[in-house]
Amino acid sequence: MSRLWGGRFRKETDPLVEEFHSSLSFDRRLYAYDIRGSIAHARMLGRVGIISAEEARTLEAGLYAVLDDFNAGRVAFSPEDEDIHSLVERLLIARVGEVGKKLHTARSRNDQVALDVRMYLKDEIDAVRELLAELQHTLLDLAERHIETLLPGYTHLQRAQPVTLAHHLLAYVEMFHRDAERLADCRRRTDVLPLGAGALAGTVFPIDREYTAAELGFAALAENSLDAVSDRDFAVEFCAAAALIMVHLSRFCEELVLWSTAEFGFAEMDDAFATGSSMMPQKKNPDMAELIRGKSGRVFGDLQALLAMLKGLPLAYNKDMQEDKEALFDAVDTVKKCLMVFTAMIGTVSFREQAMDRAVRGGFTNATDLADYLAGRGVPFREAHEIVGEIVLYALETGKTLEELTLEEYRRFSAAVGEDVYAAIRVEHCLAARKVHGGPAPETVRAAIARARKRLERV
């Protein structure tokens, strides 16, 4: 088979090189984008008179026929096809004859592949953002059912202050909202047409890049031909955004793994999202949460692979850039799969409200409120903090909770304590008093859920 670039060479390529050089095993997923881009390019060539209108129609019909063959699974892949671009061109020429060789006029594989990857990534960004929206809806539905469900908030994995399960879930809604915003920003920078840049220096033909951009739905044109073919920032940006999505999923999964232990007992995974042990019959393992947590490392690796690949490249295109696709494709596939599994899983988790309630009431989570109570009675907060620390130590030594201490015991530490202290340190009061925007008070959480739902309507 003749090569797209074979005229310069006397010797055949070494078979080992052919295998090493080929990207068809992974870039074949771009076939629909490659064909769509070629159809738009053929139309443009005919529109401006670089080829005849009849030739343009022949190319377009041939390309649609090739697309049908791909969709129907009728394409036979050859080891001699270097990549999806050369395969599509070979199939087109076999179908329409010599006119097929005119398709590549005013185009290089350098701007062609940049186009394909951008088109692919725009669609995948939209798909990931939709999955993020579905996850946020699921979390909001869950939060709505748990506005009053007490949960200890933690710092350093030590019980800290009372919150609610709804408030905790809303923290992740905010993370996934930021993820969606990052992807929207990435999409804007991906939505730039590189076609027309040629190999690196544009073309002498009077092409109409604006027409091609409109045909393919691009918002802008690449402003510099060198940058157009060498830019993979958009792929790096996506992988960085995907890595953060995986960080957020991994953190949530870590909590689910912890909460599902007997030591915490806050949650139980549904049977459909857990597995057992081949040896220990009592086990119910949160394997899906652990797998998502583990797969985060893959996406971090994909990001690092892209950065390492790009860091030493001179302008413009270099063969190293063929390595962008496997990392990008893996990041896309992994984050989509993890989002789908996590959304299905989190909606089935059983939360143990009594265990959470006991943990809130048994860990001095209302100590800060006791300090605030003293500060409200004129005791300087730093002094109030010291006093409450001493009270907690005393309660630990006597085996009591703050609610179980007598007024006489309290007054050994501060005369500012009155009978109303017991109302002030009730966990329910501690929550209800935190009505600040973004706080865990039930009425504040209800408003936050409503705002988050409204925000999702605009996505």
UniProtKB/Swiss-Prot annotation:
Principal location:
cytoplasm
Transmembrane region positions? none
**EC code:** 4.3.2.1
Keyword Glycoprotein attributed: no
Query: GO terms for CC?
Result: cytosol
- Give UniProt keywords alphabetically: Amino-acid biosynthesis, Arginine biosynthesis, Cytoplasm, Lyase
| One Pfam entry name | ASL_C2
Q: Name one GO biological process term.
A: L-arginine biosynthetic process
Could you name the domain of life of the organism this protein comes from? Answer: Bacteria
GO molecular function per UniProt? argininosuccinate lyase activity
Record PROSITE patterns: FUMARATE_LYASES
PANTHER family attached here?
Answer: ARGININOSUCCINATE LYASE
**What family is it from?**
Belongs to the lyase 1 family. Argininosuccinate lyase subfamily.
Q: What is this protein called?
A: Argininosuccinate lyase
